[in-house]
């Protein structure tokens, strides 16, 4: 089977199901596991890659593309034609995060390809796990997918059982800084499962633009900074600069030294198998006395 993955989380699912050798095309962002970096790249971004962009610059550039009605991502149609994939894994959840499946089907029609396209669009932890089962059924690896999902569900249940015995802590999952956004889709449910009271966003809905005064008014006891697509070092650097804002510095979370930066790209932004690592990271950030401390390359306490 020839599989093309148009989002990093799908690439991780493919490898988790033992299908790495069947993966014939990926995106420029597919970097896990390491073998994914050796695969042909069928998706590139129009955003500059020659220098790091600030959160504000990224937001402004994305807004410009949206205003002009231009796609942020481009498909290498010639490469897809040569691959002739049997299965393409895509998404419709976020036009900013990856190629929309509509853009994919238009390209396939233009190319005359009859590839099956599966759109993975989870809004909850459970839907993320269901997506793994969907890929398993489509690729003939349903037993492996069922085994993997059963293990992931056991980990969810273990976190939930412990968290239910603990007080709920007001928690802000901050997904972007300039402008500030509170994490949406599956993130609010993760916060609740991990023993927090999710603040300023709504479960199963897109990330929500907020204001810094609203952050102060919400009085979060824990803040977890998980900027979409950022790895830990970049998230740390961005978060340290935010302490110059009085709204953040005056929150109970900042006063109580409960402000954290995380490796968002690996454990929160991608709805794949490693999202369970993200849940366990969140649980420790919210209730450090009751959950094992994660490895230091996953989360850092940031102090003003």
Where are these regions (language model features)?
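N-terminal ligand-binding lobe of clamshell/alpha-beta domains
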Residues: 1-304
């Amino acid at each position: 089977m020839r599989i093309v993955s148009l989002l990093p989380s799908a690439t991780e699912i493919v490898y988790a199901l033992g299908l790495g050798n069947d993966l014939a095309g990926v995106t420029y962002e597919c970097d896990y596991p390491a073998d994914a970096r050796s695969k042909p790249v069928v998706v590139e971004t129009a955003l500059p890659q020659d220098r790091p962009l600030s959160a504000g610059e990224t937001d402004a550039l994305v807004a410009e593309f949206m205003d002009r009605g231009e796609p942020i991502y481009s498909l290498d149609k010639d490469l897809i034609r040569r691959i002739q994939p049997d299965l393409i894994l895509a998404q419709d959840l976020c036009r900013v995060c990856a190629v929309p499946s509509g853009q994919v089907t238009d390209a396939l029609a233009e190319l005359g390809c009859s590839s099956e396209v599966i759109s993975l669009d989870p809004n909850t932890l459970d839907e993320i796990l269901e997506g793994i089962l969907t890929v398993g059924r489509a690729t003939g690896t349903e037993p492996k997918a069922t085994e993997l999902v059963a293990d992931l569900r056991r980990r969810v249940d273990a976190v939930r059982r412990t968290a239910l015995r603990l007080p709920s802590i007001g928690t802000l999952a901050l997904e972007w800084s300039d402008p500030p956004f509170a994490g949406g889709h599956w993130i609010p449910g993760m916060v609740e499962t991990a023993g927090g009271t999710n603040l300023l966003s709504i479960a199963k809905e897109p990330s929500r633009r907020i204001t810094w005064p609203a952050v102060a008014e919400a009085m979060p006891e824990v803040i977890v900074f998980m900027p979409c697509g950022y790895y830990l070092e970049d998230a740390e650097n961005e978060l340290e600069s935010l302490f110059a804002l009085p709204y953040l510095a005056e929150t109970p979370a900042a006063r109580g030294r409960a402000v954290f930066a995380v490796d968002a790209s690996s454990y929160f932004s991608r709805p794949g198998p490693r999202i369970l690592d993200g849940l366990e990271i969140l649980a420790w950030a919210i209730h450090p006395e009751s959950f094992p401390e994660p490895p230091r390359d996953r989360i850092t306490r940031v102090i003003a």
